[in-house]
A protein has these predicted regions:
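Extended, charged/polar low-complexity intrinsically disordered regions
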Residues: 1-58
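N-terminal pre-Walker A segment at the start of P-loop NTPase domains
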Residues: 40-84
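Walker A/P-loop
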Residues: 87-117
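AAA+/P-loop NTPase substrate/partner-engagement loops
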Residues: 106-150
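Conserved Walker
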Residues: 128-129, 161-177, 191-194, 207-216
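Conserved AAA+/SF3 P-loop NTPase catalytic/coupling segment centered on the Walker-B
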Residues: 135-160, 175-178, 185-197, 218-219
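A short helix-turn-beta junction within AAA+ P-loop NTPase domains corresponding to the substrate/partner-engaging
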Residues: 193-234
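Conserved AAA+ ATPase small/helical "lid" subdomain
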Residues: 222-278
Length: 278
């Protein structure tokens, strides 16, 4: 077996997080650099299909149980792991591992499960300190209902379009490339409608879980709406010992390397404007 691969059988003894992580070893790897070099060499040899399946397996889900559309949805949900400033509205039924994915799979992420102030999230004027969005690559709101006032909404709109943490021109280095993930669950009634006809959305508000402050087009047009309602109500968690995924330590290093290569769209726009001036 490749030194960067693990399966359920050889990780059970060290398992400490959650059954979703059965596929990945969580012990520290001392020779991580050597293993990572081997991994990258092997990764180049894999076909697109093999890469997709290996990534999904590495998230703790059995790719063999998933339909092609479900694999695509799963991959889109982890774009923020490798691309800066990718903002996603991820609404789905309960118990699909949404919160776990953003709190454990990516090394520099923060999940917020309660209310938060604008100062704590963006910039504290009194202290002259940046908030959470400056310190983490991914910030996920476990319940979008905690974002329930116009002040927060307005600041979020600005951030989604510009990456700016402060509306003051006097604050230096106030740009952040963090991605924001909005996690929520549909009501039982909406979920049934989506299950009956997931492609007829005329009478369904996909932003139903959000407060009134976030029902404006300025918000809706700036986030990716993940169609997680197309996922079957199945248990995709790996249960067999013949399914292999990437060791979590190697996976973390892989995501971090790809993220460093990423350039946010608003930075590309600023770069183009500067080029035009010159």
């Amino acid at each position: 077996m490749k030194n960067y691969l693990v399966n359920k059988k050889n990780t059970n003894e060290q398992l400490k997080y959650n059954k979703i992580l059965n596929v990945m070893a969580i012990e520290k790897v001392e020779n991580i650099e050597e293993i990572y070099i081997d991994f990258k060499a092997e990764w180049k040899k894999l076909s697109l299909v093999q890469r997709v399946d290996l990534l999904i397996n590495s998230l703790g889900k059995d790719s063999r149980k998933m339909l092609p559309i479900e694999k695509i949805i799963q991959l889109v949900s982890i774009i923020p792991f490798v691309e800066h400033s990718t903002h996603i509205s991820y609404t789905s039924p309960f118990s699909q591992g949404k919160t776990f994915q953003y709190s454990k799979i990516f090394p520099n992420s923060k999940v917020i499960s309660s209310g938060i102030t604008e100062a704590a999230l963006f910039y504290n004027k009194n202290r002259g300190e940046f908030g959470i969005l400056k310190n983490y690559d991914i910030v996920a709101f476990d319940d979008v209902q905690c974002l329930n006032n116009d002040t927060i909404a307005s600041a979020v709109y600005d951030f989604l379009s510009s990456g700016n943490l402060s509306r003051s021109n006097n604050v230096v280095n106030s740009i952040s490339c963090s991605s924001i993930i909005f996690l929520s669950n549909y009501t039982e009634e909406t979920q049934k409608k989506l299950e009956n006809n997931p492609y007829f959305l005329k009478d369904i508000n996909l932003f139903e879980p959000f407060s009134d402050s976030f029902q404006k087009e300025a918000f809706k047009s700036r986030v990716i709406v993940l169609p997680a309602y197309l996922m079957r109500d199945e248990n995709f968690i790996i249960s067999e010992e013949d399914v292999y995924g990437i060791n979590i330590n190697v996976l973390h290093k892989f995501f971090q390397e790809k993220l460093k290569e990423s350039l946010p769209l608003f930075k590309i726009e600023l770069f183009c404007k500067e080029r035009l001036k010159n």
